[in-house]
Design a protein with these regions (language model features):
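Nucleic-acid nuclease catalytic cores
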Residues: 84-121
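Histidine- and/or cysteine-centered catalytic micro-motif in compact active-site loops
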Residues: 30, 45, 55-58, 102-104
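Short connector loops at helix/strand junctions that flank enzyme active sites
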Residues: 35-37, 46-52, 81, 92-94
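Helix-rich interaction surfaces within compact, conserved domain-sized segments
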Residues: 5-21, 114-160
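Acidic-basic catalytic patches of nuclease active cores, encompassing PD-(D/E)XK
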Residues: 1-36, 43-46
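Short acidic/glycine-rich loop or secondary-structure boundary segments that cap or lie
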Residues: 35, 61-64, 107-109
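Conserved catalytic cores of phosphodiester-cleaving nucleases, focusing on short active-site segments
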Residues: 40-42, 49-62
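Mg2+/Mn2+-dependent nuclease catalytic core
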Residues: 58-85
Length: 160
């Protein structure tokens, strides 16, 4: 589990506990040679919190200018792209999907994170627009920081 994924799971669970919501956030253990559908899952009877989140982290400090679908996502041994696999899973499970993108800006600079609705990502993939630029990523709702943790507030996640 990456630090970003761990922080999201912990932040979701803190929000759930603070609000007294019957829900849980977790990450499935990844087994060797088996694909993992998503990085973070949130289970709740509340449809707004029945979520599947894929996490990606890119280093802006090292010159990354976009999240590329060919570089940052995988293709399985059957030739199925990760975006297609996750889209199928979200459709079958009924979960609301997001891509959480963390922008690492280097030592002394805070990290930023944004939530891209999965439908937006899938639309770009299907139209062969195979990247998200930093400008596009930053146009989506930010997951704001609270110290070193992320502040979970689904009402803030509406499109800017």
């Amino acid at each position: 589990m990456t630090e970003f994924e761990r922080m999201l799971v912990n932040s979701f669970n803190a929000y759930i506990e603070e609000k007294g919501i019957r829900a849980i956030s977790y990450r499935l253990k990844q087994h060797r040679f088996t694909s993992q559908f998503l990085d973070v899952l949130v289970d709740s009877l509340n449809p707004d919190l029945y979520l599947g989140i894929e996490c990606k982290s890119i280093s802006v400090e090292k010159g990354a200018s976009a999240l590329y679908f060919s570089q940052h996502f995988t293709v399985d041994k059957k030739g199925v792209h990760q975006i297609k696999r996750i889209s199928d899973y979200l459709n079958k499970s009924g979960r609301k999907g997001f891509l959480a993108v963390e922008l690492r800006r280097g030592a002394g600079h805070g990290r930023e994170a944004y939530l891209v609705p999965w439908e937006e990502l899938e639309k770009k993939y299907l139209t062969q627009n195979l990247k998200l630029t930093l400008e596009e990523i930053r146009s989506f709702p930010e997951i704001k920081r609270d110290g070193k943790d992320y502040r979970i507030n689904p009402s803030e996640w509406e499109r800017k």
